[in-house]
């Protein structure tokens, strides 16, 4: 696509883009709620709360459970969530189809690859390692590495500086409006994926430069051979 001809690097969101992490997140939230005598929300509902970081995830869970928000309750529930998620993050997460093969092709073509996630930083590296994709990333920016998270463009500015790229040279790929808003605010071209966690909204409503239904479609979108072509 002409709009992606200047691309010299690609950055990705994590949850809902590279990794289906809803099962592990839901288990941790439900155990944190149960510890306080509250009902379990379940994976289908928790998946609609993903994308703004752990604090917001906890706040949404407490609001759903009908508990009044206060700093002490949020802090206590967040501590419980962290405790349980440390046990569920790896076994409760799996790569979406063709993610690893696509990352491998991007790397083979000399493109630096970055990761920008609102997920708490301590959980990121162990998850990437367990899934076998950690070595593909030149720069990883977690939720604790910046003062403000996506949809603010600050994490993208930080990544651009670390990679030495101009905004127009870095493609950002994500599954939620927070990803698209952050990319647009930073001046980066962006691709929205239809299969992730976007609060029940179609990603097209956020007006990314391109919408893809399959992760591997990224390769031909930026002018590289598709995985099928490489198998011939």
UniProtKB/Swiss-Prot annotation:
GO MF annotation terms: metal ion binding; phosphoglycolate phosphatase activity
* Keywords annotated in UniProt: Carbohydrate metabolism, Chloride, Hydrolase, Magnesium, Metal-binding
Residues the entry annotates as binding Mg(2+): 13, 15, 175
Q: What is its EC number?
A: 3.1.3.18
Question: What are the record's GO terms for cellular component?
Answer: cytosol
Q: Does the keyword Cell division apply?
A: no
List, alphabetically, the Gene3D superfamilies matched: HAD superfamily/HAD-like, Putative phosphatase, domain 2
Record-linked NCBIfam families: HAD-SF-IA-v1 (TIGR01549), HAD-SF-IA-v3 (TIGR01509), PGP_bact (TIGR01449), PRK13222.1-2 (NF009695), PRK13222.1-4 (NF009697)
Free-text function comment from the UniProt entry: Specifically catalyzes the dephosphorylation of 2-phosphoglycolate. Is involved in the dissimilation of the intracellular 2-phosphoglycolate formed during the DNA repair of 3'-phosphoglycolate ends, a major class of DNA lesions induced by oxidative stress.
The UniProt subunit note reads as follows: Monomer.
Could you tell me what this protein is called?
Phosphoglycolate phosphatase
Query: Organism source for this protein?
Result: Yersinia pseudotuberculosis serotype I (strain IP32953)
Show the taxonomic lineage. Answer: Bacteria, Pseudomonadati, Pseudomonadota, Gammaproteobacteria, Enterobacterales
């Amino acid at each position: 696509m002409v709009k992606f001809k200047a691309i010299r690097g690609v950055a990705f969101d994590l949850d809902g883009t590279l990794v289906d992490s809803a099962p592990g997140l839901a288990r941790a939230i439900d155990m944190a709620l149960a510890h306080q005598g509250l009902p379990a929300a379940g994976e289908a509902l928790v998946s609609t709360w993903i994308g703004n970081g752990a604090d917001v995830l906890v706040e949404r869970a407490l609001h759903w459970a009908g508990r009044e928000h206060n700093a002490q309750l949020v802090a206590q529930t967040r501590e419980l969530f962290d405790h349980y998620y440390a046990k569920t993050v790896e076994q409760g997460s799996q790569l979406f189809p063709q993610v690893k093969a696509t990352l491998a092709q991007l790397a083979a073509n000399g493109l630096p690859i970055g990761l920008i996630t609102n997920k708490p930083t301590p959980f990121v590296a162990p998850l990437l390692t367990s899934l076998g994709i950690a070595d593909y990333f030149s720069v990883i920016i977690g939720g604790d590495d910046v003062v403000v998270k996506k949809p603010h463009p600050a994490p993208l500015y930080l990544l651009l500086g670390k990679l030495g790229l101009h905004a127009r040279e870095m493609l950002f790929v994500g599954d939620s409006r927070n990803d698209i808003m952050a990319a647009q605010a930073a001046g980066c071209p962006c691709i929205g994926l239809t299969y992730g966690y976007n609060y029940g909204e179609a990603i097209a409503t956020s007006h990314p430069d391109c919408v893809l239904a399959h992760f591997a479609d990224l390769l031909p979108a930026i002018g590289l051979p598709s995985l099928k072509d490489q198998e011939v």
